[in-house]
Amino acid sequence: MILPINTYSDEVLRRKAKPLKESDAQLEELISNMLESMRNAEGIGLAAPQVGVSLRLIVVDLSLAEGYEAASPMVVINPHILSVKSFNSMEEGCLSIPDVRGDVVRPSAIQLKYRDRNFEECIGEFDRLAARVIQHEIDHLDGTLFVDRMQRRDRRKIQKELDALSRGEINTNYPVAFHEDSVVK
């Protein structure tokens, strides 16, 4: 089932998500729905808070990105970054902040501890686009949006677009959830 994606002004995007304690049929359904919703929106990453669920769960599928066509979808539960290497700046966007893009500095490689779709504990090394997408989605679990990480002068350049999103002026090809009473100031 395709879920609506919560937008910039929704308070669920500003909350720290709760860890998952176990896997069950509801979690499996949420994972499947998130993957379907992400693909429908032509995204490469999606965090549970973006679909209104405040849990530490992300899905990533880089197969839509050039050079990553063979990538398999990844489910990341309760992620924790163990280490980082070097930093670089790259333009990012977000399904919750449609049509807004900006440069963000992030580590270019990470070591990540997490649980997979089967709730098995994993430690993985990720670099380049995979590292960036995972960090972007982990930020969602911590109530941080990519625009919060932009340099102040760059953020000022997109403020009009953010204000428009806060007013509900949203044009996407995928379903969104807009909650007027949770506008971020």
UniProtKB/Swiss-Prot annotation:
- Residues bound to Fe cation: 94, 136, 140
The top EC class is: hydrolase
Q: Which Pfam families match?
A: Pep_deformylase
Quick check: keyword Iron in the entry?
yes
Q: Keyword annotations for this protein?
A: Hydrolase, Iron, Metal-binding, Protein biosynthesis
GO MF, one annotated term = peptide deformylase activity
Question: What is catalyzed by this enzyme?
Answer: N-terminal N-formyl-L-methionyl-[peptide] + H2O = N-terminal L-methionyl-[peptide] + formate
Q: Does the keyword rRNA-binding apply?
A: no
Task: List the active-site residues.
Answer: 137
Q: How is the cofactor bound?
A: Binds 1 Fe(2+) ion.
Annotated coiled-coil segments of the chain? none
User: What cofactor(s) does the depicted protein rely on?
Assistant: Fe(2+)
User: What Enzyme Commission number(s) does the record list for this chain?
Assistant: 3.5.1.88
Question: Gene3D superfamilies recorded for this chain?
Answer: Peptide deformylase
**What's a BP term from Gene Ontology annotated to this protein?**
co-translational protein modification
SUPFAM superfamilies assigned to the protein according to its UniProt record, in alphabetical order? Peptide deformylase (SSF56420)
What family, per the record?
Belongs to the polypeptide deformylase family.
- PANTHER family the record matches: PEPTIDE DEFORMYLASE
Q: What does this protein do?
A: Removes the formyl group from the N-terminal Met of newly synthesized proteins. Requires at least a dipeptide for an efficient rate of reaction. N-terminal L-methionine is a prerequisite for activity but the enzyme has broad specificity at other positions.
**Name recorded for this polypeptide:** Peptide deformylase
